[in-house]
């Protein structure tokens, strides 16, 4: 759940940044209403229970609701929707409006079976993409922590040039507290 909360809290910090752009024609204080965070878990038995606990703490998930068969038909996925008012940081501390966190619209898709990453992308684009009709999609893997303004800069690349069809961000290894991560040769390289 640490990697998950690191990523989601980073996204929520980015939403806060977008909402702080008071002179923007697109963003501003209600900018959060233009963003939907879609989380896709690849298999009900595969997702870590503590990740589900984190989602439940945010109000997004309810334990015991999902069933694998309904009316004698196999269920493929379970979808939960909630607008959360709080975030969990990587230290599992709640952060809310008092820390500047804006509301966040969350769609959580818990796939019944593990069918790997490309299937999850298919779910995102074919199911949620068709329903939401987004202008821009940003895909993040769990554990990736976007810098506080990273999503703004990705969005800006699309906004400034309608011919841009894709953009990529730079990934930097986290050095850890006191740069102790540099003791790991993979991080240090």
Swiss-Prot record:
Disulphide bridges, residue numbers: none
Pfam family of the protein (one): Chitin_synth_1
Reaction(s) catalysed by this chain's protein: [(1->4)-N-acetyl-beta-D-glucosaminyl](n) + UDP-N-acetyl-alpha-D-glucosamine = [(1->4)-N-acetyl-beta-D-glucosaminyl](n+1) + UDP + H(+)
PANTHER family with a match to the protein in the record: CHITIN SYNTHASE, CHITIN SYNTHASE 2
Keywords tagged on the record: Cell membrane, Cell wall biogenesis/degradation, Glycosyltransferase, Membrane, Transferase, Transmembrane
Species name: Aspergillus niger
Major location (coarse): membrane
Function: Polymerizes chitin, a structural polymer of the cell wall and septum, by transferring the sugar moiety of UDP-GlcNAc to the non-reducing end of the growing chitin polymer.
Protein name: Chitin synthase 2
A GO cellular component annotation in the UniProt record: cell septum
Coiled-coil stretches: none
Membrane-related topology note: Multi-pass membrane protein
Family the UniProt entry places it in: Belongs to the chitin synthase family. Class II subfamily.
Location(s), subcellular: Cell membrane
GO molecular function: chitin synthase activity
Bilayer-crossing regions: none
Superkingdom in the source lineage: Eukaryota
GO BP annotations listed: cell wall organization; chitin biosynthetic process
EC class (word): transferase
